[in-house]
């Protein structure tokens, strides 16, 4: 039976004194304080500079964002502290193959910018569930996807980031875990609720710069310490822990020696930890779900000035996604060389002694190197990098979750809600999500496993493929209708939940004690399972759609690929119902506004609730046209297309080099 650690054991395990004392000096603390002050200053500047008093201003930054902050925000929204912990940890455990999750994303970003975003913008939507409502009609798809997306935010996105951030906080600051997380989430929630998407994007840009600078510095220290790249490749394959026996266990050499294919990304289709067919066929499916249908990501692309800026932002982020191999994966592998007994520990009692967890300490590879290698001041900078990655991801999740709740759920409960009420509801929901996140921390703490990145990717493989299948068919197959899409999602969700719940119930097992989960359910690698789930959902969707009535083209103009350039007027499927609701709501009357005191005016300014001048009918039409415009300047179109081709060539080359 596998050794386990109860929550109380984790809480009572003392942190190693040398690590917890590392940040207790004036230089490091000063850098961290300066970081927080600068981030808050940028957030406040964005809060005062941008228009947050309208739905479009708060949730889409008024569609006035340039390509470079959008690209930085896309990168920062994706790269959280769980990447520094998860990618480095899996790199330490098994080598470079884990970077394929990042490199696949570079290709998906091009598909996002060239195929999916033009459809989303032409449809005039703010959220992904809203797109499904326009494309298929009805409300059950919109509500279902909104609730599922919020569920994924809590159990996957937020939980992974908080868990990874908690590792740094515990090691570096020695603070109480819950106090530190509460402070981080509180700061994050404040400038998300007050600043809107523009504030999030500008702070993401700052934090991307901090992340890249700090990560490059640590990479330099790491390669210098290990003696260069050639020395690194030689020493890694010999990095085995000194203690490989104990706890009355018979431990196989494969559990503690580096893999023979550590420096290759394409591994055996059956025995590989990341099999090569899964990389080619399964990984793009989960990447498609995350990058092309995920509210957190797509919302950033919907705020671009024009399509050229959107495409340039996607290219910028795609290039940045090539860096984690050198900034995270290889430093994690170097950490195994430098701190072998801790990072590569295999005997449960030894692992508990080093990091308080019996399943392994690979998740501590990057944090340990930060605290051991970096000099004073730079240690504070690197902790700021970790905090930056954590907070940038959380702000993105909070803002997008707020958008989902407000646009897709709250408007169903309060059909006559004013714009001001919707803005307030969105902000309050962020605060509620903060509370839920804190409550979730104990569950994350006791469910930690040896490799965080495999946890996040497996959950994505169980929940994401049905969503990806429906969006692909919605855009490329106009014959698909609401009944097919709904039941395709339902069947896919049932299949995914059966696999996920069964795996949680039996456990994923470890090298020391394999899981007892039935092979028919858990015996298939999660990347292979994502392929089955994707095409299974697609077949159900197509089959039911072909057996039921098609949607007339008049309802599909600019909502699917073959009709994307149509200039015909589109009639929404629920147009009659919508018209009746507007009639029932009545016309909003203009009442003379009462004089407001200084404190109330300051409150409105801080929360973005101040009213701007009322738009004329012509101005409203111009704004609506701007929000659905996909035009490009010819010169910019040529530049971004050339860069896209160049990027694809680079991605193919690096895959071949490390194959």
Swiss-Prot record:
Q: Where in the cell is it found?
A: Cell membrane
UniProt region (Disordered), positions on chain: 573-592
Look up the domain of life of the source: Eukaryota
Q: Which residues lie on this side of the membrane: Extracellular?
A: 48-64, 127-171, 230-270, 335-423, 477-526
Residue spans of biased composition, Acidic residues class: 582-591
Q: Which InterPro entries match?
A: Na/Glc_symporter_sf, Na/solute_symporter, Na/solute_symporter_CS
Question: Where does this chain mainly localize?
Answer: membrane
Q: Report disulfide bridges, numbered on this chain.
A: none
One annotated GO biological process: sodium ion transport
A GO CC term assigned to this protein in UniProt = plasma membrane
Q: How is its activity regulated?
A: Inhibited by phlorizin.
Additional detail: Although it belongs to the sodium:solute symporter (SSF) (TC 2.A.21) family, lacks Na(+)/glucose symporter activity.
Q: What is this protein called?
A: Probable glucose sensor protein SLC5A4
């Amino acid at each position: 039976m596998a050794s386990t650690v109860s929550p109380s054991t984790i809480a009572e395990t003392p942190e190693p004194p040398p690590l917890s004392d590392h940040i207790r000096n004036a230089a490091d603390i000063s850098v961290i304080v300066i970081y927080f002050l600068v981030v808050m200053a940028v957030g406040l500047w964005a809060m005062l500079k941008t228009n947050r008093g309208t739905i479009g201003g708060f949730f889409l930054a008024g569609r006035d964002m340039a390509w470079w902050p959008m690209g930085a925000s896309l990168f920062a929204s994706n790269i959280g502290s769980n990447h520094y912990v998860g990618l480095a940890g899996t790199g330490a455990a098994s080598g470079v193959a884990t970077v394929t999750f990042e490199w696949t994303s570079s290709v998906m970003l091009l598909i996002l910018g060239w195929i999916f975003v033009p459809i989303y913008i032409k449809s005039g939507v703010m959220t992904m569930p809203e797109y499904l409502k326009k494309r298929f009609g009805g409300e059950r798809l919109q509500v279902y996807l909104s609730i599922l997306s919020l569920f994924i935010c809590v159990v996957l996105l937020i939980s992974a980031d908080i868990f990874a951030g908690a590792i740094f906080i515990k090691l570096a600051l020695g603070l109480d875990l819950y106090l530190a997380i509460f402070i981080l989430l509180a700061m994050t929630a404040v400038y998300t609720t007050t600043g809107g998407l523009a504030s999030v994007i500008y702070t993401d840009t700052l934090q991307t710069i901090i992340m890249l600078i700090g990560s490059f510095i640590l990479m330099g220290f790491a390669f210098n310490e290990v003696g260069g790249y050639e020395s690194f490749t030689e020493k890694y394959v010999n990095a085995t822990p000194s203690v490989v026996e104990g706890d009355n266990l018979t431990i196989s050499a494969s559990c503690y020696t580096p893999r023979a294919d550590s420096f290759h990304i394409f591994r055996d289709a059956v025995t590989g930890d990341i099999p090569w067919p899964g990389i080619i066929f399964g990984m793009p499916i989960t990447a498609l779900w995350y990058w092309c249908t995920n509210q957190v990501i797509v919302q950033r692309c919907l705020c671009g000035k024009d399509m050229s800026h959107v495409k340039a932002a996607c290219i910028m982020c795609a290039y940045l996604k090539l860096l984690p191999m050198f900034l995270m994966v290889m430093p994690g592998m170097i950490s195994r060389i430098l701190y072998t007994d801790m990072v590569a520990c295999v005997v449960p009692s030894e692992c508990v002694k080093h990091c308080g967890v019996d399943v392994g300490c690979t998740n501590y590879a990057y944090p340990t190197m930060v605290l051991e290698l970096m000099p004073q001041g730079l240690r504070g900078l690197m902790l700021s990098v970790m905090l930056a990655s954590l907070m940038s991801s959380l702000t993105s999740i909070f803002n997008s979750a707020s958008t989902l709740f407000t646009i897709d759920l709250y408007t169903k409960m309060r059909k006559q809600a004013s714009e001001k009420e919707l803005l307030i509801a969105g902000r309050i929901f962020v605060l509620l999500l903060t509370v839920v996140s804190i409550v979730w921390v104990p569950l994350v703490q006791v469910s930690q496993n040896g490799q965080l990145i495999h946890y996040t990717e497996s959950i994505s493989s169980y929940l994401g493929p049905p969503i990806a299948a429906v969006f692909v068919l919605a855009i490329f197959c106009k014959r698909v209708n609401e009944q097919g899409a709904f039941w395709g999602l339902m069947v896919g969700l049932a299949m995914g939940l059966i696999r996920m719940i069964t795996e949680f119930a039996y456990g994923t097992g470890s090298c020391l004690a394999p899981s007892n989960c039935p092979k028919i359910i858990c015996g298939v690698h999660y990347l292979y399972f994502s392929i089955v789930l994707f095409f299974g959902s697609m077949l159900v969707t197509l089959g039911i759609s072909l057996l039921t009535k098609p949607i007339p083209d008049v309802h599909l103009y600019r909502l699917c690929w073959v009709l994307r350039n149509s200039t015909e007027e589109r009639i929404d499927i629920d147009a009659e119902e919508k018209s009746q609701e507007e009639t029932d709501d009545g016309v909003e009357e203009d009442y003379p506004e009462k004089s407001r005191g200084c404190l109330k005016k300051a409150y409105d300014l801080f929360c973005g609730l101040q009213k701007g001048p009322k738009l004329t009918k012509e101005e409203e039409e111009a704004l609506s046209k701007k929000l659905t415009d996909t035009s490009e300047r010819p010169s910019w179109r040529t530049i971004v297309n050339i860069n896209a081709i160049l990027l694809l060539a680079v991605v193919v080359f690096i895959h071949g080099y490390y194959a």
